[in-house]
Regions:
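Extended beta-strand/beta-hairpin segments
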Residues: 36-108, 116-200
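Extreme N-terminal basic, low-complexity initiation segments
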Residues: 1-14
Length: 200
């Protein structure tokens, strides 16, 4: 008999109408590890791209996690041939303010992915972009039980164009958002409030 607390899914794996295509995670015990796999909806005519990173926690201050205040949240993220990213937790959770936290990295990935698609579409449209900056902001809410999730991310890109129609340049942000791999992978609102500047 199914657990009453387990969400119900249709045959296609969707949770209700318009819900995320994700099947209930299945845990397999492999050599002492618990591997949880989420089976998403299948897209037609796709190619897989794989991304591998390593993470090393270097915050053992001598007694490990013997107490909540007895260890550092610092870590390093690495990948072959790339400089390490020095990370920690948000300072609100006893992290190091000078290091990147996971929440900032998520916001940054949305900003960067949108920018890459925007430049691609601008080049295709014959619009010459000479500068692009963004001030992206994310809002996360945390419940009393400590469980948190992102509520929204707003991008504020300022795009400088040398030629082309400024209004056309502005409208390219919509398809850039629709094509952004990261935006398509999150379940919260990602908004864009662009500014277009025409170079002198």
């Amino acid at each position: 008999m199914p657990d009453r607390d387990m969400p119900s899914f249709g045959e296609d794996g969707a949770r209700g109408q318009g819900g995320p295509l994700a099947r209930w995670p299945q845990a397999n015990h492999v050599r002492g590890r618990t591997v949880v796999r989420f089976h998403g909806g299948v897209m037609a005519n796709t190619r897989e791209h794989r991304y591998a990173v390593s993470l090393i926690w270097n915050g053992n201050l001598g007694t490990g996690t013997s107490g909540y205040r007895d260890y550092s949240r610092d870590y390093e993220i690495g990948a072959d041939g790339k400089a390490a990213i020095h990370g920690s937790a948000d300072p609100a959770f006893r992290g190091d303010r000078s290091r990147w936290n996971p929440e900032e990295l998520l916001v940054a990935s949305l900003s960067a992915c949108h920018k890459l698609w925007y430049l691609h579409l601008a080049a295709e449209a014959g619009i010459t972009v000479t500068a692009y900056t963004d001030r992206a902001e994310g809002v996360m809410e945390v419940g009393r039980d400590g469980v948190g999730r992102f509520k929204s991310v707003v991008l504020h890109p300022t795009v400088t164009v040398a030629n082309g129609d400024p209004e056309r340049a502005r409208t390219l942000h919509k398809p850039a958002h629709e094509k952004c791999f990261i935006a398509n992978s999150v379940n919260f609102a990602v908004e864009c409030e662009p500014e277009i500047v025409v170079a002198d």
